[in-house]
Amino acid sequence: MKELKDHVVVITYGPSSEASVTASPVSQQTPSLFAYSVTPSASRFSSRRASVHVIGLVLRFITMVLCFVSALSLAVNVQRPSKRHLTQNSSSFASYPELLYCFGVAVIGFVYTSLQTFKGVCDITHRGVLISEPLSDYISFIFDQVICYLLVSSSSVAIAWIQHINEDAIKTLRNNSIVSVSMSFSAFLVLTLSGLLSGYKLCKRFMW
């Protein structure tokens, strides 16, 4: 009677163990096929994000150079006027609020884009050590809009000043102001593209 029980136990547990052995290869194949199917799409997504990051970095570098040239074209004409010749027709841009505003905005744009360029290079080399990606997307989108507004407003103010100034005594300053406004408006156009790219990255973050 005892041997019959042992024999019955062997018969009942034998098929279940065999079934578990045959079922295990099927369960192991499913994740491997899924993993191979996901890898190409993930690599394409990461390469697309890397290309967007590089394009944004190039746009900010171009904006930085344009803002630097805009500020430099006004700064090279600085002369320290004497107290006796401190009149309205001074050849220094600091004597005119419109040009001083344009110079200040160009300096602000240069500092901002320099920091963004430095951060972009650090993100490529050190994989986002300075600021996290979500916070960086928000900061870039907001400050791109602010700097764009400042650039276009300073260009408009400087253009109005150039149109009303015809004195020969400040002809050099007027020519330098034209160069500064041209560079400032070009920086506005390039930074607008960078702002659109920042908005695209922010929308993609909301979608994902």
UniProtKB/Swiss-Prot annotation:
Belongs to the Casparian strip membrane proteins (CASP) family. The chain crosses the membrane at residues 54-74, 93-113, 142-162, 177-197. Glycans are attached at N89, N175. Residues 1-53, 114-141, 198-208 are cytoplasmic. InterPro entries: CASP_dom. Residues 75-92, 163-176 are extracellular. It comes from the Eukaryota. It is found in: Cell membrane. GO terms for cellular component: plasma membrane. It is a multi-pass membrane protein. Homodimer and heterodimers. Keywords: Cell membrane, Glycoprotein, Membrane, Transmembrane, Transmembrane helix. This is CASP-like protein 4A4.
